[in-house]
Amino acid sequence: MSKIQILDPVTIDKIAAGEVVERPASIVKELSENAIDAGATAVTVEIEEGGISYIRIADNGCGIPKEEVPSAFLRHSTSKIRSVDDLLHIHSLGFRGEALSSIAAVSQVEMITKTQEETFGTRYRISGGKEEDLEETGAKDGTTFIIRQLFYNTPARRKFLKTPKIGRASCRERV
């Protein structure tokens, strides 16, 4: 019998990510809902290999201020609620603060975002939950997510993904 032990934070994050990100369509759903919550009037979705190797979602919403970008990828980080009382009056599609951290835990993420007030946009890269780069860049108002290599660091999860054709159909249903 194995001894009971507390899991390390990296393992916890990968397990938790599986509850939010089951397949490419989960990412399309979560990021499209974020775009709608950000006031977007246009959302573009592109996928390759059924979303397994590449998903790009671009919107013209309010964007994320540069100083808030790294925090957006932390677990339980949200702009939608502040306290338990807010749960009684939710008017957004998302509010848990789980989507971005979960997506980043199991894929390679590049986000380009710009608010209307900013002169330049921000490019942020995070892979497997580890921050890689944050830099200023030219960008339109809104946010673009590029998700690459879904479940690259959790081979058991990647093995259970459906074929690209099924993944593409599932993503199409979410849009």
Indicate where each model-derived feature is located:
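N-terminal phosphate-binding caps/lids of nucleotide- and nucleic-acid-binding domains
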Residues: M1-R174
